[in-house]
Amino acid sequence: MNNRRNVSLQCLQTALKLMPTHFAFRLALSIFMAVLPLLGMSMSRSIYSYVEASSNSPQVLSALVFPLSMYAIYLILTKAYTVYYQRVAVQFGAILTFEKKIKLLLHKKTGEIDMRFYEDPSFYNSLWEAKVASTNIYRVAECLIEFISISVSILVLSSYAASIKPLFFVFIFLTAMPSLSEQVCEGILRSKRQKELAIVAKEERTRWEHITNIESAKERIVFGNYPLLKAKWLHTTNQFQEIEFALDRKLLKLSACFALIRLIAIAGIYVSASWFYYIGNIDYADFITTISVALFLQAQYGELFEVIGYYSEFTTLVKPYFKFMEIKSDFPSEIACDAGTIQLKNVEFSYPTSSENVLQNIDLLIHPGDKIAIVGVNGAGKSTLAKILSGLLHPTAGVASGLQSRYTRVMLQDFQCYALTKDENIALSEIHPKDPSLIRSLSELLDIADIPSGEILGREFGHRDISGGQWQKIAMARLFYHQGSVLILDEPTSAIDPLYEKRLNEIILQQATPDTTLIVISHRLSISKLLNYVYVMDNGRIIEEGRHSDLLQSPNSVYRQLWEAQTSWYK
């Protein structure tokens, strides 16, 4: 119970933080609409009293004007509230606005989470569940407002019914029990279904993207795997529908059972009211009003328990959002270090999906302005070390210092190719490029000036497609455009032809000023001889280090073996 109360408070705090005016106005309006039926009932009672009195003796017609006018106002206000606020303002305005704002909070949170979490596949399930659960915050807030307004309405109208005949209050209350039982059972079933559907829904969406997205169109054509992908999607879709249909069948049986009980309870109201009217304890107006109040309250009780059921469901469904928002990064302790110096000491790293360390006992000391290369065969741990040095990942053991992401610019091996123009790809994070002249000079320097600046890149159907080498140059231009005191390049020439590789290496050194720390990670050694110092990695360890010329002097060094193997290609 306390847990559900805490979730409710979190939902209210979030809702009021994002849309305070909306929810305050919504509460005030709901309470007003909760009291409004009292006006309708009292006016209808006056009208029926007038009709009954008219059957016995002539009545002044003007006495009917006021109750009819007020009853008309009641009907107009009720209809206007239903049509405008519930169907227009809420469904097509407030909910959409709230969803946009809550997604921005999620996006902000994903930018604050340690990158190590992104290496765990289960993290993406948590992120997906949080995204789906986030809209339930609005629903929880709405349920609480509805609960307050319906409770006020029931209290007011029950008091009104009791003023006619106290016994009616007891009968009306008894009609609420079937609705209560139905909503509790339905809420339990819906919560169970939502939990079962969460993973299936994600899988179904992924399967659908496999057979519809443009990126995989080529492989669908080349390998002819469309029938397989379609069969996988249909299987998941059928599984999704079976879970939904199973719940619908159970709900139908429950509804039929409780509808019968509810019918018996309503019949009891009619019989008791008819008996009191027959023996003369109430007049015709009281009889009709009692029946109207009973039917209205019976519907109100149904709505109340429906809201309670939805509240129970939504407070359960919303938990993944708050669980995701409470994720905290465990940052390693730092050691004292000179300004601008990067130091790793006994650093180890393992991905959440593996028990083995990808990096082991890494010791590095990089001073401001150092130009170093980190080389090794594929799978040596170079890219993981690059992410450690850039601050994207944090060591699982050991200490690190000087990893200031604000001043570090990184060109990752798996850099992003955005469906934007060339200029937008380079000046990424700037809505309007602040330095168009720098973009032009970098484009000329990297031989990508011939790519039109105004065309969307990266889509084969309808937009301009460019080669992998051109994309790599754009990623490098992005790095140089944003500048920084530390430049990290992970496999910067992997898609570049050998004829241009030498020129690109010279450009990299040219862009790194004497005060700039340059770290190049590569399994191609053409650039390592141009840098001051070389670290050689294998199986997650630094096995050799030194200057290029010194490492070549050692006949058994791994670096020399790599160098000779690569240079032999061109002999």
Language-model-derived ranges and their functions:
Residues 225, 269, 288-327:
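Cytosolic ends of transmembrane helices, especially the final helix of ABC transmembrane type-1 domains
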Residues 514, 524, 529-571:
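C-terminal portion of ABC ATPase nucleotide-binding domains
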Residues 23-84, 147, 151, 157-190, ...:
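Transmembrane helix-loop-helix hairpins at lipid-water interfaces of multipass membrane proteins
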Residues 1-37, 57-67, 90, 120-155, ...:
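Membrane-integrated ABC transporters
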Residues 390:
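Helix-to-loop junction immediately C-terminal to a conserved catalytic motif
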Residues 127, 418, 445-474, 569-570:
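ABC-fold ATPase nucleotide-binding domain signature/coupling loops
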Residues 17, 129-140, 192-199, 209-212, ...:
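An intracellular "coupling" helix at the cytosolic face of ABC transporter transmembrane type-1 domains
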